[in-house]
């Protein structure tokens, strides 16, 4: 229980139970001790997205498939903080909650994994590519319309087993997860970053969600990485303006260099037959989160003017076949 008072008590970290989620929670636990002087323990919480494994994510519907139960535990004060893969975090919070910190971003790339084929171009016509994501499906089909993208659910180990068992010719994972779990070419013969693919908002970064009134909120904010927060804030503002969620075919990626923020994005149908794609750049101070959000909003409005919302409505009806 996290309901004990006192600024020096042990904190309770809420986490999903997958190996990747627990790696992330352990990482934050070590950061809390090293950088904040705080002791903590991890409490595993099963989410709706963890329980429903036989349905593609896009067909389950609803928001917060991997976060809602964690947020309920925050609100009831049964945990002090929740550690999320930021790409899974809805763009709107309940008023009592917010992100205390966004950690330094790992690689935001998506990654091609295969036992028999060295890259996406080497796959034969009709090859089966496994992915959880309409965004990935859209971009793979745009790149190679002859490939068959299929829903792939389960934790990373389950997905790798399906690849090894021949259910798929290749699978697509987030590069950050591959790096964190130290998956290498001894496990899978070919691991190739997909540089052409625009990632999901927040992909590669971790978010620490807390109650705003927590006495630990400001102490934990020291774990915030300014550059990652700046970029992710623009990405989340873009998706929020489009009224999209975590399971829709939207890719958006921000990069910050030399006081310039560059945003690139793609929106379209899951089969890649229709897409909108664009990029924008503006001068921004690294501390100016409002400016980065405004850039994301203005960029999204360009997409809306080109029919992005109508495209997303059609995409929602198609989902996975």
From Swiss-Prot:
Superkingdom assignment: Bacteria
GO cellular component: cytoplasm
MF terms (GO), sorted A to Z: hydroxymethylbilane synthase activity
Pfam family, one: Porphobil_deam
Annotated cofactor note: Binds 1 dipyrromethane group covalently.
Keyword Membrane appears in the UniProt entry: no
EC number: 2.5.1.61
Listed pathway(s): Porphyrin-containing compound metabolism; protoporphyrin-IX biosynthesis; coproporphyrinogen-III from 5-aminolevulinate: step 2/4
Function: Tetrapolymerization of the monopyrrole PBG into the hydroxymethylbilane pre-uroporphyrinogen in several discrete steps.
Assembly and oligomerization: Monomer.
NCBIfam families per the UniProt record, alphabetical: hemC (TIGR00212)
Protein name in UniProt: Porphobilinogen deaminase
Higher taxonomy: Bacteria, Pseudomonadati, Campylobacterota, Epsilonproteobacteria, Campylobacterales
Name of the encoding gene: hemC
């Amino acid at each position: 229980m996290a309901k004990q008072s006192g600024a020096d008590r042990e904190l309770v970290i809420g986490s999903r139970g997958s190996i990747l989620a627990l790696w992330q929670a352990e990482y934050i636990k070590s950061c809390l001790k090293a950088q904040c002087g705080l002791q903590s323990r991890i409490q595993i919480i099963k989410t709706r997205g963890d329980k429903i494994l036989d349905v593609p994510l896009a067909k389950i519907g609803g928001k917060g498939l991997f976060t809602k139960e964690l947020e309920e535990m925050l609100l009831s004060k049964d945990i002090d903080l929740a550690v999320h893969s930021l790409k899974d975090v809805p763009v709107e919070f309940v008023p009592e909650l917010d992100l205390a910190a966004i950690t330094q971003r790992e690689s935001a790339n998506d990654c091609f994994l295969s036992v028999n084929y060295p890259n996406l171009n080497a796959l034969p016509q009709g090859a089966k590519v496994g992915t959880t994501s309409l965004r990935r499906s859209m971009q793979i089909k745009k790149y190679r319309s002859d490939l068959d993208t299929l829903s792939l659910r389960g934790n990373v180990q389950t997905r790798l087993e399906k690849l090894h068992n021949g259910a798929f010719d290749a699978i697509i994972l987030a590069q950050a997860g591959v790096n964190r779990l130290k998956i290498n070419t001894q496990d899978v013969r070919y691991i190739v970053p997909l540089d052409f693919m625009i990632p999901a908002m927040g992909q590669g970064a971790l978010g620490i969600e807390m109650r705003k009134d927590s006495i630990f909120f400001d102490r934990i904010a020291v774990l915030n990485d300014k550059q990652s927060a700046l970029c992710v804030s623009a990405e989340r503002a873009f998706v929020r303006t489009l009224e999209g969620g975590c399971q829709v075919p939207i890719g958006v990626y921000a990069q910050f260099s030399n006081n310039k923020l560059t945003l690139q994005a793609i929106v379209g149908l899951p089969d890649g037959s229709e897409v909108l794609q664009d990029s924008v750049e503006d001068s921004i101070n690294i501390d100016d989160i409002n400016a980065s959000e405004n850039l994301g909003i203005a960029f999204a409005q360009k997409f809306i003017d080109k029919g992005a919302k109508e495209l997303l409505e059609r995409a929602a009806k198609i989902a996975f076949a």
